[in-house]
Design a protein with these regions (language model features):
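A "functional boundary" signal
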Residues: 2-5, 17-142
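Bacterial N-terminal signal peptides
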Residues: 8-14
């Protein structure tokens, strides 16, 4: 009986680990395609489930928001990008993802007609980038 329990738990852990690696691999693939083939990235992201650790869910939310924006799909509901922010705001060392999250959140706010809200987010990015050399993100703002 004890052996069956151990065997069952081992199988669950094995298959969960395989799924997790596959999920992360698909997120990596979508991220790599975002700049030049955003439609392909969006297709991959639509095939994935919003599961995994909080970090994986936040990454998915950020990538999906970015893919929607790059495919010119107008989104005015900020619930998805706020999910990413609820994770990245606690990770100041991940400045790149913090800035991307704030940027795409600002883009959603602009589309929703909330220009002051968008401006606050863009100014927050500017403040975060003040002491760094991140020309890509500064370029997005201007």
């Amino acid at each position: 009986m004890k052996c069956r329990i151990i065997l069952g738990l081992s199988a669950i852990l094995f298959f969960t680990g395989c799924y997790n690696r596959e999920h992360i691999s698909r997120l990596d693939e979508a991220e790599a395609l975002l700049q030049n083939k955003p439609d392909s990235a969006l297709t991959i992201l639509k095939q994935l489930r919003r599961e995994g650790s909080q970090a994986e869910q936040a990454r998915y939310a950020l990538l999906y928001s970015e893919a929607l924006d790059k495919n010119h799909i107008k989104v005015t509901d900020d619930s998805l990008i706020r999910q990413a922010w609820s994770h990245y705001k606690h990770h100041p060392k991940d400045l790149r993802r913090q800035c991307k999250t704030l940027y795409y959140w600002g883009r959603v706010k602009l589309r929703a007609g909330d220009k002051p809200g968008a401006l606050r987010l863009f100014l927050e990015i500017e403040e975060k980038l003040k002491d760094t050399n991140e020309p890509y993100y500064a370029g997005l703002l201007y």
